Structures are given as structure tokens and as C-alpha cells.
Regions:
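C-terminal motif of bacterial Sec signal peptides marking the signal peptidase cleavage site
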Residues: 53-54
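Extracellular/luminal Pro/Thr/Ser-rich low-complexity repeat and linker "mucin-like" segments
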Residues: 103-107, 114-159, 278-301, 390, ...
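Extracellular/luminal low-complexity segments enriched in Ser/Thr/Pro
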Residues: 149, 209-211, 281, 334-339
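Proline-enriched interdomain boundary motifs that mark the N-terminal boundary
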Residues: 272-276, 620
Length: 713
């Protein structure tokens, strides 16, 4: 059964196919020990069916040498019929009806007053050798917790469940083998109470109550990692990592989570990499900040690096020769600089440890383009999660990382409306915390924070909703009033808000394009994230579980007009750098706006003055007869020439491999030889009515960027 009051139970995630890739948290309350684990097996079967639902998506596009397709014309097919409120329900091809129904039924499932009673806390933490904590990310150790029964106690045949996170490689709390990691013991000092722990191979341990009831105030001691190999903790550093206890107080097989989890702080692993982030666009004489961070191997901040960072700045960039780290800065510093001369500049840096064995980490910052009156590119990650749904870390840490480590200009935290342990749509205090944190970090002209959440529809695909003001409501996908896109857009009508479809071509669930993107509320779409690319099946990092015909290029081919952005959809607390902890890449949005404000960001997104990357800070300019990316050109007249001038310029982070020109589904390719700065200008046949054209950039490293299309009216 499903609970609506924070009484969810997360099942074991299913690798990179469904649970892990989606970073989902199952929301079930049936006590598995009562059903011989049939419930959890059903969830596993559901996850497997989700994998099998994916099919290979293909289109008719063929990559040809540059020049071949530049001289061809094609017209997109006619538009599909648009959805209306009067029509019957139409769902995504791979809609997860079982998940939707489980979540919905849990909103009305009654539980006994004794369910969810009690409290729990962390007693001690230690490394395997017995040294007291805190534990480092990815380290094995031992954690001891106490659960104390609430006023109504726990009856005979009732259960207390101990649960660790199903994400980031926490070891499951098993009681089968003391010689294996994750071994967990339970005990009580309550005379006459017998504890019967049962583990079903998931991230939770069910503790049955026998002999007599566990009375109010009586305790259960849980030692996680009691064996000699301990238990491995989160691979990402975070404050307040949550360990939940849920209680079936009357033994009826339904349980509820207690009001608050036991928490433990996980500190960063040892320093392993240097990251330097700088603005991409500056004018001569302009001051800037270089954000310099020494991170652990998974990208977590908080390292105690002690030493120096030396800079090799090119002529035209003024920076200190070196900065010193004492070990108390949390592994990060702001370093001021000045762009003295026009040009393309790349800053190199070396971090040298000052204690014991010397270690060196090298990095090259993203390129800086310095020009008079340059169009400003602002880097944004407007899709990510914290521990308030299915992510890692606090909202405050999320925004701090975005600015002080990733050097972002614009960021939004978009926790799920109804997915996790406690749900945003049922806990107004959590939504208030997010609103307060967004306000506290917002600094117009320096750092723009945007209020948001994720509309998590398992029937029509996931969208994040962001508000360009301090306040906004959660219109939950589980609420029948807002369960399809038309209802959501009706609720948002007239507000300074936007929606963004993401992982639209597959992954956890694809977007139901039967509801066309709203012309005002959804002008752009997210085509790259940790899930992969939804641009096209021929993208080098195409999304897993693809749905045929559901890629964004398929959408363009039938006449819809959307711009492109990327965003991380990170669940690791690292907005702007989600790709550091994910081999498949991440996502960033490049937004052209002179005014670094919520109003300027909203205007640029509505105008589609954007491009997408998979995490790299590639700079590009694209125009067609002076019309910039995202533009809809006016209708052709008899006086117009038969050709148009296409201008492309790319400045990359690493050696370039290809630049593709995508025209109405056809592709022409420039094969490159490792250039870092590439430009091209040529005449092409004029775009005909209904056509579109965009640019795809591919680096040798796998870094990608996509310009928003230019459309012919």
C-alpha cells in the first residue's frame, strides 16, 4: 500500500536502467516480512518491465559530409492533432500506471494510530578501526542508532523497519553474514521482548516484535556495520544524511515512517581534483571572480586541502600568481581577476599539496571570450534535487555549491512534488524551507536563484516548474486537478512561470507529446541531463530506454518550435557539475541575457536565446542572415535572395571532433582536427516555410553542445 504522510518505503534500485538512473524512492508501506517479500518482488518486476518498455528510436536522418545537405531542402510532416480537455486520457507510450496508482492509493490509505510512533537518533559513529567519526564519503564504518517506542508502543507481531538510502551505494543492512559489509545487529534491554530481524535483500531491515509488546519509551539498539568490514556509506558528502525508521504498530502489515529521521554527517573523501570556473564572456577591463575548488573524486566540496594553487594566466588576463590554502577553507576560494585584453583566453592551474607526500592536481578553466559589447552568456542549472525528495544534501548546501564551486549564474532546485520519503505536496514546511532558501541566496546582478519543483507525472512524463518570483504553488501531478499538462498549464496561466519537459525521449518515463509544448509556458525543452540526451537517436549520448519517435528532433520535424537547454537533473548536490560524478555526462543551459536577474532570465528563455550542453562550458554563436539562435524568421518575400548566410563560431573546452548542421532532420558534418576555436561562414539555400536549423558540437572528449534552432515562419 502507499502512504501519504511520509510513510514511504524505498525498494532496491535497479541499476542504471530504472531505479538508479531515475534516482527514485519507492513509496510503499506493506511490511515485506508479512508477505514473504512478494511486495518488493512486484516492485522489482515493475522496474524490469520499465526497462523492457524502452525501444530503439530511429529517424531517417543520415550524416553526410558538409555541403551535401546544406544544398538540400526538406519539409516536415504535418502536425499531429492537439490534445484538449474534452478528449479521453492519452498517456506516454511508456507510462508507469502501476507507480501512479500506488502513489495515488497511498494518499487515502488509513493507518493505525500506533503506526509511525516513536523517535530515533544516532548514538555513535566510528571507522572500522574504532576511531570515532565523522565518516568520509565512500568509507566503511559503524553507525549505532536507537529507536524509542512512542506512546502507543508496538504490539506483538508489529514491526520496526530500519532503512538506509537506496542511492549512492550505501550497503544494505543485512543480518545474514557477519563477514560481509553491511552486517547489522539489533538488541533491546526490554525484558520479555524478542526481536526477530528479517532482511529481504533490500535497503531495509524488518525487526519483528515477539514475546510481548514494546512499550512506550522502550528502546531498540541498531548497529549498522557491526561486522569487521563495517558498512559503506554515501559516496557523496552531505550534511544530515537520513536514516529512517518506520513502524507497523498494530501488526496489520501497514506501516508509517516516524516524524523525523536519524541523521549523520558524511564528510568529503580526500582531495582528488582541481576545478576552476570562470565567466565565459567579459569585456576588456572587466573584473571577474575565478572559483577555485579542490574536490574529492566524486566532486564533493569540503576537503581539507593544504597547499597552494598556482595559476598560468595568458597575456591579457590578470590573476595572482598563486593562492594559499590553509586547510580551513573547505577546499574552495574566490580569486579575483581582471580581463585586460580582448581575445580568447584559457587559464591553467596547478594545486600542490603542502603536507607529507606532495600531490599535484592540474586543471584548465573554461575559456574566456573577451570582446567589446559581447553578448553575455549566463550559465544555468535549473533542474536538480536535494534530500527533500530523492537527492543528497540540504537546499542551503545546494545553492552554496552552485555559486561557490560551480560558479553558476542562475540556478533552481526542483525537488519532486510527490516522490521520496516525505512529499512536498503534503509537507508545506518543506516547501517553505525551499522558498526561504531561494530568497536568502538570491543576489540580482551576481547570482540568480529561481523557485521550482518537479511535476512528477508517471502518466505524461516529468516536467519541472519554475517561478520567476518569490512565491509559487505546488500543483501536484498526483492531484486530479493537475494530473495532465493542460491542467498544469491552466493553473500556471498568467503567472511568471515556465515548465520544462525533460528526459523526454525515454529514461524513467518519456514525455507525452500528444500535449504540444505550450507556446508561452514551455518555449524551451531540456535535451541533456544525467539521463543522457533526448535530442535525437543519433546523439553520441542518447538517453537509455528510448521511445521511437519521441526525441526532440522528431518533435521539430512535425512542426513544433522549442529552444534547447541542458540541466543536470543531479541528485548528488552538485548543481552545475553533475557530470563530475556521472560517467554519462550532465547538462547546462547557456542563456543569453545582459541583465542578470529573474526578469532577464525569463525574457531570454521565452525568446529561446539559449543553447544546451552536457555539462561542458562550450561557447558558440550561430546566426542566419543575422537571426540568432531561437529566432523565428519572418515569412519569405519575393525580394528575398535564394540563399542565406550561415555564421558559426565555436570556442570549446577541448579538441573539437565534429560540428553538425541539422536542417529539418538532415545532417551535414564538418570533420575537424582538434581545433579549439573554429568558425565557418557560408551561403546556404534559404530555409523554406516550416523548416528549422540548429548546430551540434562534438568534442573528442564526448562534450556536447546544441544551439537552439532557427525557424522559418
Amino acid at each position: 500500500m502507499i502512504s501519504s504522510r511520509g510513510n514511504s518505503l524505498r525498494g532496491r534500485s535497479l541499476g542504471h536502467n530504472f531505479g538508479d538512473a531515475c534516482k527514485s524512492k519507492w513509496s510503499v508501506t506493506r511490511s515485506t516480512s508479512k508477505t514473504d517479500s512478494r511486495w518488493i518482488l512486484a516492485l522489482l518486476a515493475l522496474g524490469l518491465s520499465a526497462v523492457l518498455l524502452g525501444c530503439s528510436g530511429e529517424s531517417d536522418s543520415t550524416v553526410r559530409p558538409a555541403g551535401d545537405v546544406l544544398n538540400t531542402k526538406s519539409k516536415p510532416a504535418g502536425l499531429p492533432p492537439a490534445a484538449s480537455q474534452d478528449e479521453g486520457p492519452v498517456y506516454s507510450v511508456d507510462a508507469k500506471h502501476d507507480i501512479h496508482n500506488m502513489l495515488r492509493s497511498g494518499m487515502t490509505t488509513p493507518v493505525d494510530p500506533s503506526d509511525g510512533g516513536g523517535k530515533a537518533w544516532l548514538v555513535s559513529e566510528a571507522r572500522i578501526n574504532g576511531t570515532p567519526g565523522p565518516l568520509r564519503a565512500g568509507e566503511a564504518g559503524r553507525l549505532e542508532f536507537i529507536y524509542e517506542a512512542g506512546p502507543l508502543g508496538v504490539a506483538v507481531d508489529g514491526e520496526v523497519h530500519f532503512q538506509v538510502s537506496s542511492f549512492w551505494q550505501w550497503d544494505p543492512p543485512q543480518n545474514k553474514d557477519p563477514e560481509s559489509r553491511g552486517y547489522t545487529t539489533v538488541r533491546t534491554d526490554a525484558d520479555g521482548v524478542e526481536l526477530t530481524p528479517v532482511w529481504h535483500g533490500t535497503e531495509l531491515l524488518a525487526i519483528g516484535i515477539a514475546g510481548r509488546s514494546l512499550e512506550a519509551g522502550e528502546q531498540i539498539h541498531v548497529t549498522y556495520g557491526a561486522g569487521k568490514f563495517g558498512a559503506k556509506v554515501d559516496i557523496f558528502a552531505e550534511r544530515g544524511a537520513e536514516h529512517w525508521f518506520s513502524v507497523d504498530g498494530d501488526g496489520d502489515g501497514l506501516r508509517k515512517f516516524i516524524d523525523a529521521p536519524a541523521t549523520v554527517d558524511i564528510i568529503s573523501a580526500p582531495s582528488a581534483q582541481l576545478v576552476v570556473m570562470v565567466p565565459t564572456t567579459l569585456e576588456p577591463g572587466e573584473e571577474f571572480i575565478a572559483f577555485v575548488s579542490i574536490l574529492d573524486k566524486m566532486g564533493s566540496t569540503g576537503t581539507r586541502f593544504s597547499g597552494i594553487v598556482e595559476f598560468d594566466a595568458p597575456d591579457g588576463i590578470e590573476l595572482p600568481a598563486r593562492v594559499k590554502f590553509s586547510g580551513n577553507e573547505g577546499g574552495r576560494q574566490r580569486v579575483p581577476g581582471i580581463a585586460r585584453k580582448a581575445g580568447v583566453h584559457r587559464i591553467s592551474a596547478t594545486a600542490i599539496s603542502g603536507k607529507g607526500q606532495k600531490l599535484e592536481y592540474k586543471a584548465t578553466a573554461n575559456p574566456i571570450i573577451v570582446e567589446e559589447n559581447i553578448a553575455r552568456v549566463r550559465w544555468a542549472d535549473i533542474h536538480g534535487h536535494s534530500k527533500l525528495s530523492d537527492g543528497t544534501g540540504t537546499p542551503d548546501d545546494y545553492f552554496t555549491y552552485a555559486r561557490e564551486v560551480a560558479g553558476l549564474d542562475i540556478v533552481s532546485l526542483t525537488d519532486h512534488d510527490h516522490w521520496g520519503i516525505q512529499f512536498l505536496d503534503e509537507h508545506p514546511e518543506m516547501w517553505q524551507l525551499i522558498r526561504d532558501t531561494v530568497k536568502a541566496h538570491h543576489r540580482p546582478g551576481e547570482f540568480v536563484t529561481v523557485l521550482g519543483y518537479e511535476w512528477t507525472s508517471w502518466l505524461h512524463g516529468h516536467r519541472h516548474v519554475i517561478y520567476f518570483e518569490d512565491e509559487g504553488e505546488i500543483y501536484s501531478a498526483l492531484d486530479p486537478k493537475y494530473e495532465n499538462p493542460l491542467q498544469l498549464w491552466d493553473a500556471l496561466s498568467g503567472q511568471p512561470a515556465l515548465t520544462f519537459a525533460h528526459h523526454s525521449a525515454g529514461g524513467p518515463v518519456s514525455t507525452n507529446w500528444y500535449y504540444p509544448p505550450h507556446s508561452v509556458l514551455e518555449p524551451v525543452t531540456e535535451i541533456s541531463s544525467v539521463h543522457g540526451s533526448s535530442e535525437s537517436h543519433d546523439s553520441p549520448s542518447a538517453i537509455y530506454n528510448p521511445v521511437r519517435g519521441n526525441f526532440v528532433r522528431d518533435l521539430l520535424n512535425v512542426g513544433f518550435r522549442v529552444g534547447f537547454i541542458g540541466s543536470g537533473d543531479g541528485h548528488d548536490g552538485h548543481p552545475g557539475l553533475a557530470h563530475l560524478g556521472n560517467d554519462g555526462g550532465g547538462g547546462l543551459a547557456a542563456i543569453f541575457t545582459e541583465e542578470l536577474s529573474r526578469e532577464g532570465t525569463l525574457e531570454a528563455l521565452r525568446a529561446r536565446r539559449t543553447y544546451a550542453t552536457n555539462g561542458a562550458r562550450i561557447w558558440m554563436q550561430v546566426s542566419l542572415d543575422g537571426h540568432v539562435m531561437g529566432t523565428t524568421m519572418p515569412p519569405r518575400t519575393e525580394a528575398d535572395a535564394a540563399t542565406q548566410t550561415l555564421k558559426i563560431r565555436v570556442v570549446s573546452e577541448g579538441p573539437l571532433k565534429h560540428v553538425d548542421i541539422v536542417r529539418s532532420g538532415n545532417i551535414s558534418r564538418f570533420d575537424l582536427n582538434g581545433e579549439l576555436d573554429w568558425s565557418n561562414e557560408r551561403a546556404i539555400p534559404r530555409l523554406e516555410r516550416g523548416e528549422y536549423q540548429y548546430i551540434r558540437v562534438i568534442e573528442e572528449s564526448g562534450a556536447l553542445a546544441w544551439s537552439s534552432p532557427i525557424f522559418a515562419n
